[in-house]
Amino acid sequence: MDDFQTAIYFFDAAVTEDIYYGADPVDNPKPSTHFLMLEGEANYQSAKELTKFAQTKVERALEYYTKLTSNSEILELTLDDLRKEFIYYALMATDKPGLRTLVTAFITYFIEWDFRNDHFECEVKKGTSEPFFLHLFRGCILFESLMKLNPVISPKSKTIGGILQEPKIISKLKIKSIQGKKDGFVLEDIFDKSQRYDNSIDQAIQISYMARNTLGHSLGWDANINQSQYRELYLIIGASCLHVIACLWRKT
């Protein structure tokens, strides 16, 4: 079984020790820091192939995100930007150790999809959707956490719906105010919205918000998720995470 979360837990433990003894992911990198910094091109690392694998999956998500925002005023987010503005900042923020969890969650979210996607080859069409729902929900929690803990604008609200209605936040994200639903969303709402998805960052954020408030309240939906729906939601939620980093984690 590909237990990515446990594997990265030990990578992070190594990074903790290396930084304690003087390592710096940029100025004095070590094999452990190369992985969390997604530096698959770097030499002198025993996990080079795994690092390259992780980097490739994040680059795939960046490519998707770039297509969503190519016709907007949003500044492009490159892999180097991601390393500098998010990963390096989080690794070196010793007064905010919780940010490290965002980095490891970010990496595991993007690399886990390929493993989960292979499950569909077993053709269990009416069985459990737990692996897919929990994977997507982790991405939703990451999306929410990136907004709550961003270093540029501290949100006043404690809920994702409230945050996505704060004028300063939506202005920085360059999106419209997110609308909820009085009786709450159900899984079919997400699938319907995804079918009408216009490949805009506005709708990507809306769908991610809906997924957060649906998968976060129940796993026992009668509707199963299919392979194409899983792939689409994985990319949409990932793009939403990258958008928050692009707009709310740049310090300049």
Model segments located where?
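Short, hydrophobic, well-ordered secondary-structure elements
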Residues: 100-114, 126-158, 238
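Extended amphipathic alpha-helical coiled-coil/heptad-repeat regions
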Residues: 1, 6-14, 26-29
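Short, solvent-exposed segments of well-ordered alpha helices
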Residues: 93, 97-100, 126-137, 195-206, ...
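Charge-enriched, short contiguous segments at helix-coil
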Residues: 191-252
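Alpha-helical junction/boundary sensor with strong preference for TPR arrays
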Residues: 11-25, 68, 72
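Flexible secondary-structure boundary motifs
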Residues: 147-203, 218
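Charged alpha-helical initiation segments
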Residues: 9, 30-132
